[in-house]
Amino acid sequence: MTKLALFYRHLAVKGPCSPLEWLIFAFLLPLGWLYGAVMRLRALFYRIGWFDAYCADVPVISVGNLSVGGTGKTPVVDYLIRYCRSLDKRVAVVSRGYAGGKGAALRVVCAGQGPILDVQQAGDEPWLLARRNPAAIVIVAPHRAQGVRHAVENLGAEVVLLDDGFQHLAVSRDFDLVLLDALRPFGNGQVLPAGLLREPVSALRRGDLFVLTRCPEDLAGTADVPGPVVHCRHILEESAVDLDGEVRSLRELAGLRGIAFAGIAEPEGFFRELQSHGLTLTRTLHFSDHAAYDERAAILLKDAAKSGDYFITTEKDAVKLAHMTLPLPCFQVPLRLMFVETGQLEQKLSPIISNQR
């Protein structure tokens, strides 16, 4: 991540501190107010019917957030796919996609028999969901309504998960699941570009259930939101998998020098988790979210390799490394999701999922 990007993220998360930061913030703040007003009007026009929203013939559950950047959404979507499958429902995920398969065409990543596109065509998150859940339907569609319609009418979806759908009001939904980072739910509280929020905090009134993600064990209290809240933690598995599929215990790596890298929005939490499992990290590298791992990335990794014995990264990053020749062994560590309030999410969603129109 560039110094400019790091500076902006600091400003958007913690707010201005220095005179220069206050000057920049004062310039961005009116733009944020304007953007927030536009988003309020947009939501109002959908609510009163001036803008049309596509209504599917099956239950649609939106999984989204209020801010840009990571809230740990992919593990939650993965969890919901598995839950729908446990209810014997044919489930589809419809995603806008990111940096995969340029163009506006609808792409079926998985039709229920594993991925049928490569990660470059599908995008990292849809491809990872398809690999983890080969019996699910995964579609990337810049026009989400088109993707939902295709999943239901052509592929037999009985439940649709609208990935990153909170602001995508052109598709009607039966349930809005809103994810918030437990440690920084609203950043500095301002709307883009003055902060990280896609909409004003008042938009949370549309939410049906709020999930505080990445909760530390000592978390006290909760975010001020207008609805029920559940808490979850993202926990590293006790084993790591290299790029050839060989499994090794994290304990085996603890005595070696590790170099951790990640192209996710909030890599610091991942790095801390690795260290909490006893790994010694001599260096950490933060690439941009959804990084493509190009020649520049290869040069950075080659240089970093001088100070370590192995690389370690996330599942989402590992799927994009097949084309690279790395100078050290590289391991990925899977994440699993643990809800603090066992059963509350399922209790809310079960009647929605079971209600076929």
From Swiss-Prot:
Enzyme class: transferase
InterPro entries reported for this sequence: LpxK, P-loop_NTPase
Keywords from the UniProt entry: ATP-binding, Kinase, Lipid A biosynthesis, Lipid biosynthesis, Lipid metabolism, Nucleotide-binding, Transferase
GO biological process, one term: lipopolysaccharide core region biosynthetic process
Keyword Lipid metabolism: yes
GO molecular function term, any single one: ATP binding
GO CC list: plasma membrane
Top-rank taxon: Bacteria
Catalysis: reaction(s): a lipid A disaccharide + ATP = a lipid IVA + ADP + H(+)
UniProt keyword Kinase present: yes
Residues at which ATP binds: 67-74
Entry's EC annotation: 2.7.1.130
Pathway noted in the entry: Glycolipid biosynthesis; lipid IV(A) biosynthesis; lipid IV(A) from (3R)-3-hydroxytetradecanoyl-[acyl-carrier-protein] and UDP-N-acetyl-alpha-D-glucosamine: step 6/6
Family membership: Belongs to the LpxK family.
PANTHER family linked to this entry: TETRAACYLDISACCHARIDE 4'-KINASE, TETRAACYLDISACCHARIDE 4'-KINASE, MITOCHONDRIAL-RELATED
HAMAP family linked: LpxK (MF_00409)
Function noted in UniProt: Transfers the gamma-phosphate of ATP to the 4'-position of a tetraacyldisaccharide 1-phosphate intermediate (termed DS-1-P) to form tetraacyldisaccharide 1,4'-bis-phosphate (lipid IVA).
Protein known as: Tetraacyldisaccharide 4'-kinase
